[in-house]
């Protein structure tokens, strides 16, 4: 079991203010966590590849498709600064050519 001094040090590092009852509770909980890691360290993981998660997560996206907005002309003409079929927007990047 973890001693009080270790719990106090961990609480200090975590910027936690705990009372003596909480110290006892944290000591039991931290000891349980360390016991669990001790059990895990007994497993043979030599042929197990390192990973950051239990299952692979990937984005599921649809394919992009190019299509016109039904009222494209109306939309462009009602914009603050239309230029042909496009929106004129303020420049946000400076280039060396300016």
Swiss-Prot record:
GO terms for molecular function: asparaginyl-tRNA synthase (glutamine-hydrolyzing) activity; ATP binding; glutaminyl-tRNA synthase (glutamine-hydrolyzing) activity. It catalyses: L-glutamyl-tRNA(Gln) + L-glutamine + ATP + H2O = L-glutaminyl-tRNA(Gln) + L-glutamate + ADP + phosphate + H(+); L-aspartyl-tRNA(Asn) + L-glutamine + ATP + H2O = L-asparaginyl-tRNA(Asn) + L-glutamate + ADP + phosphate + 2 H(+). Its EC number is 6.3.5.-. InterPro entries: Asp/Glu-ADT_sf_sub_c, GatC. Heterotrimer of A, B and C subunits. Allows the formation of correctly charged Asn-tRNA(Asn) or Gln-tRNA(Gln) through the transamidation of misacylated Asp-tRNA(Asn) or Glu-tRNA(Gln) in organisms which lack either or both of asparaginyl-tRNA or glutaminyl-tRNA synthetases. The reaction takes place in the presence of glutamine and ATP through an activated phospho-Asp-tRNA(Asn) or phospho-Glu-tRNA(Gln). Pfam families: GatC. This is Aspartyl/glutamyl-tRNA(Asn/Gln) amidotransferase subunit C. Belongs to the GatC family. NCBIfam families: gatC. PANTHER family: GLUTAMYL-TRNA(GLN) AMIDOTRANSFERASE SUBUNIT C, MITOCHONDRIAL (PTHR15004:SF0). GO terms for biological process: glutaminyl-tRNAGln biosynthesis via transamidation; regulation of translational fidelity; translation. The keyword Heme does not apply. Keywords: ATP-binding, Ligase, Nucleotide-binding, Protein biosynthesis.
């Amino acid at each position: 079991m973890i001693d009080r001094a270790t719990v106090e040090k961990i609480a200090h590092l975590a910027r936690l203010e705990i009372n003596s009852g909480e110290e006892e509770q944290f000591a039991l909980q931290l000891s349980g966590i360390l016991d669990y890691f001790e059990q895990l360290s007994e497993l043979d993981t030599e042929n197990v590849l390192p990973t950051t998660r239990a299952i692979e997560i990937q984005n599921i996206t649809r394919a992009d498709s190019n299509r016109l907005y039904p009222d494209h002309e109306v939309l462009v003409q009602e914009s603050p600064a239309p230029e042909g079929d496009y929106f004129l927007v303020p420049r946000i990047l400076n280039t060396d050519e300016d």
